[in-house]
Amino acid sequence: IEGIYLPDDNILFNSTRCGTSVDCWFTEVSNLFICDRSGKYMRQIGFDQVHTLHPVLLEDGRVVYTRWDYNDRGQIFPQPLFQMNFDGTGQAEYYGGNSWFPTTITQPCAIPGSRKVMAVLMGHHNPQHGKLAIIDPEAGRDENEGVMFVAPVRKPEAVRVDGYGQEGEQFQHPFALNQTDFLISYTPLGYNIGTPIEFAIYWMNIDGERELLVADSKISCNQPVLVAPRRRPFQRVNMVDYTKNTGIYYLQNIYEGRSMKGVTPGTVKKLRIVELEYRAAGVGCAYGHGKGGGGHAFSPVGVGNASWDLKKVLGEVDVEPDGSAFFEVPSRKPLYFQALDENGHVVQTMRSWSTLQPGEIQSCVGCHEHKNLSLIHI
């Protein structure tokens, strides 16, 4: 489902053929795949724990999508926007990866002539509609820093709510025509939670002026798309080398980044490399609780606050005195890292994961550094 054309004429789509199931339930997981236009050369490029949804192509050739991030986190607030290059390289946070708000960011669409996206903000345990916003990562990456409601334009409050954005008028599936006008599935009347509501297609602008285009008394109208020629997005060189089965990480300085605040340089001696192993089916449930909500881990490897997934330690690599590290890892695997001191104790752990494509070389400035941070001058 959710297929999109890529600049190199391949097709990116979402599929449950990865064969795993949701950590907190029994539903099949959907991940991102690529094939050519005839359906050949199909390969998986997202190796993600739960769903990756609603991929959209930006004008600069990047793909933005919703990714569920459950690794060592609660189950309610882990649905930020992620980004990747069209060949699957460069998978990284786009917005909200270390944030309580917005609860869920989904159904993104590119805004022509802009590096921003329009998206729907909603909760975790509610239907797939909510409030409409423009996301600007250049203004910030977390909470409400780079978020602006539209129709009308206003700044949202950063709140911590599960069923977010379900009061009043409801929005679904925006399609931006330019930086002020868009098509939208919309209902002005709202609904009572649990009661189906009917959507219609509107033209609308960011001030909230609107015109009804399509409506049906018996069924909702959703997912408008403009059928018109468009400029092919930027096509960068494909960096994937499928003759290889590894990739390389370069870390410039592990002490850079908000999560390492207060850690004395020289404390971290090694990085532990851990692979997440997902499950094909639920085998029971361990109930955990925390600030991120309850956690129903259906692949229990312990009791009480059990881990979502099995963790396989691949090894450890040295961290140099200047905080740098350079190491090779298996490609096409979900990996996360733990910073260790001289006693092998964990100083900080990564509550997400990273995946490299074959032959990919990926660099980072620090440990959970702000994504708007430039390289450190040496």
What role is predicted for each listed range?
Residues 377-378:
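Conserved small/polar residues in nucleotide/adenosyl-binding loops
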Residues 104-120, 162-177:
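Signature of short aromatic-glycine-proline-rich micro-motifs recurring in repeat-based ectodomains
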Residues 21-31, 73-82, 126-136, 193-202:
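Structural motif
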Residues 11-15, 63-67, 116-120, 182-185:
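Residue position within the beta-strands of beta-propeller blades
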Residues 17, 69, 123-124, 138, ...:
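Residue-level signature of beta-propeller blades and closely related beta-rich strand-turn architectures
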Residues 6-8, 58-59, 112-113, 177-178:
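Residue-level detector of Asp-centered blade-edge/turn motifs that repeat once per structural unit
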Residues 135-147:
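Short loop/turn segments immediately following beta-strands, especially the blade-tip
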Residues 201, 361-372:
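The canonical Cys-X-X-Cys-His
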